[in-house]
């Protein structure tokens, strides 16, 4: 059968919080089968726990932010979430000693390295997938996000549309089937991006204090300000796809479906996930006893790092 996955051992890393600009330590710990993905604020006494869920996301203005009923928050979970989703992790305790996950270099690549360095092991319990049964679509103006039935894995098709000389039509769309290999080699290094005018405004109101050219792509009216340029020619749309993978994994399960989006962001991604889960006819839990019947990316030999 396709089994659940966790880490072989605990691991930690220290970085900077995107909004606070302060040091943050992230610790990832193995968890027993059927625990799920659980975030924890360990700087509070007692520690506050956040099981992964679509409903826990209550702020999507600048990132994907979990907030509980007492107003306790953990921000910027999407890049770590995307890394966990791509590696098929099911059970993990994510501890952080601040209100946000460290931004690292603005991509998911440092989290991939951290997870693989700790090692991934299978557990003696069947892995649950969410399989899409009916098409669900959400819209906001000209923006939209949609999930259609597709049982072979998670298919992704993302389009951005920015009026900027550095964002030409040939770098606005990207398509990919989610697997560890595709994620690591094709999109994991894609960094978050922003515009200089937005950075100046955010920092004036005390946000994005940890943002810099070391952890984001910054564009002015005409060019990219980062001296090293882009890591991929289509890095911007690839990062938006990376974000969507992390946002959809807030349900705590790998999804089998066909996701497509136009100008979507954290808010619309979460709105789609909530709409899917609210419609009991739109999805179902499935497990796979026969590894040969498993979705793409989860078959024996396709995840060679286990």
UniProtKB/Swiss-Prot annotation:
Pfam families: LpxC. The keyword Nucleotide-binding does not apply. It comes from the Bacteria. One of its GO terms (biological process) is lipid A biosynthetic process. It is an enzyme of class 3 (hydrolase). Its EC number is 3.5.1.108. Its cofactor is Zn(2+). One of its GO terms (molecular function) is UDP-3-O-acyl-N-acetylglucosamine deacetylase activity. Belongs to the LpxC family. Catalyzes the hydrolysis of UDP-3-O-myristoyl-N-acetylglucosamine to form UDP-3-O-myristoylglucosamine and acetate, the committed step in lipid A biosynthesis. This is UDP-3-O-acyl-N-acetylglucosamine deacetylase. It comes from Actinobacillus pleuropneumoniae serotype 3 (strain JL03).
């Amino acid at each position: 059968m396709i089994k659940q996955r966790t880490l072989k051992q605990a691991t930690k890393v220290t970085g900077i919080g995107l909004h606070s600009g302060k040091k943050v330590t992230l610790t990832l710990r193995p968890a027993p089968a059927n625990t799920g993905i659980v975030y924890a604020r360990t700087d509070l006494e007692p520690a506050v726990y956040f099981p992964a869920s679509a409903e826990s996301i209550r702020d999507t203005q600048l990132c994907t932010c979990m907030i509980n009923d007492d107003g306790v928050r953990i921000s910027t979970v999407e890049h770590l979430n995307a890394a966990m989703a791509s590696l098929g992790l099911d059970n993990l305790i994510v501890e952080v000693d601040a209100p946000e996950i460290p931004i690292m270099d603005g991509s998911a690549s440092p989290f991939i390295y951290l997870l693989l360095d700790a090692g991934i092991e299978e557990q003696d319990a069947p892995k649950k997938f969410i399989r899409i049964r009916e098409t669900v679509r959400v819209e906001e103006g000209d923006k939209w996000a949609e999930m259609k039935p597709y049982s072979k894995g998670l298919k992704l098709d993302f389009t951005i549309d920015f009026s900027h000389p550095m964002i030409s039509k040939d770098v606005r769309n990207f398509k990919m089937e989610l697997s560890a290999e595709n994620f690591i080699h094709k999109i994991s290094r894609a960094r978050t991006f922003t515009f200089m005018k937005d950075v100046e405004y955010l920092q004036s109101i005390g946000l994005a204090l940890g943002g810099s050219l070391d952890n984001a792509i910054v564009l002015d009216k005409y060019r990219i300000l980062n001296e090293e340029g882009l890591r991929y020619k289509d890095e911007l749309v690839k990062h938006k796809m990376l974000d969507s993978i992390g946002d959809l994994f807030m349900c705590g399960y790998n999804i089998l479906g066909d996701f497509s989006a136009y100008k979507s962001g954290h808010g619309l991604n979460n709105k789609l996930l909530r709409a899917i889960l609210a419609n009991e006819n739109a999805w179902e839990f499935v497990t796979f006893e026969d590894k040969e019947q498993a979705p793409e990316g989860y078959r024996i030999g396709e995840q060679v790092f286990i």
